[in-house]
Curated annotation (Swiss-Prot):
PANTHER family (alphabetical): GTP CYCLOHYDROLASE 1 (PTHR11109:SF7), GTP CYCLOHYDROLASE I (PTHR11109)
GO cellular component entries: cytoplasm
Catalytic activity: GTP + H2O = 7,8-dihydroneopterin 3'-triphosphate + formate + H(+)
Biological or metabolic pathway of the protein: Cofactor biosynthesis; 7,8-dihydroneopterin triphosphate biosynthesis; 7,8-dihydroneopterin triphosphate from GTP: step 1/1
Pfam assignment, any one: GTP_cyclohydroI
Signal peptide: none
InterPro entries (alphabetical): GTP-CH-I_C/QueF, GTP-CH-I_N, GTP_CycHdrlase_I, GTP_CycHdrlase_I_CS, GTP_CycHdrlase_I_dom
Source organism (scientific name): Clostridium novyi (strain NT)
Protein name: GTP cyclohydrolase 1
Top-level EC class as recorded in UniProt: hydrolase
Record: residues binding Zn(2+): 76, 79, 147
Lineage of source species: Bacteria, Bacillati, Bacillota, Clostridia, Eubacteriales
Amino acid sequence: MIDYEKIKKAVIMIIEAIGEDPNREGLKETPDRIARMYEEIFSGIRETPEKHLSKVFKVNNDDVVVEKDIQFYSMCEHHFLPFFGKVHIAYIPNGKVVGLSKLARTTEVFSKRPQLQERLTSQIADSLMEYLKCKGAMVIIEAEHLCMSMRGVKKWGSKTTTIVTRGEFQKDNSLKQDVLNILRL
């Protein structure tokens, strides 16, 4: 559970620090709105992927499973500005698969917290290896970072791509290339 009062006090201090009046009509309810928003967008802090990856289904083959274009958003831990984009997940089952929605939910567990894209990519892949005991995992994230668009270098529309491979995807370049071809990356 988050500390609403502490967040509200901090937001009031920020409003005052930038030279605004926290009692101005448009800002009166802002501290409460931000506290409620933070509970939602940082809900992954209180979750683990285990609850999403523990329900599995037996399969008789170990063909690659690819779930692409999972939309996500997260908050850059350096500037507390959003980054957002698409996650593509591939894994090689080891006799069991997980429901496809569980891959999106696992993405949310890790994206709904202050985050780095590089860490997010690794956490998703590592959780698949740990909980599914799959033969290999590959996660690709393409994201736009508002800390690159709104401030500093101000390069709107630039995207960052991170790729993490585990297991068989690290050992067999043709498997990795097959997934990239499916995704057309």
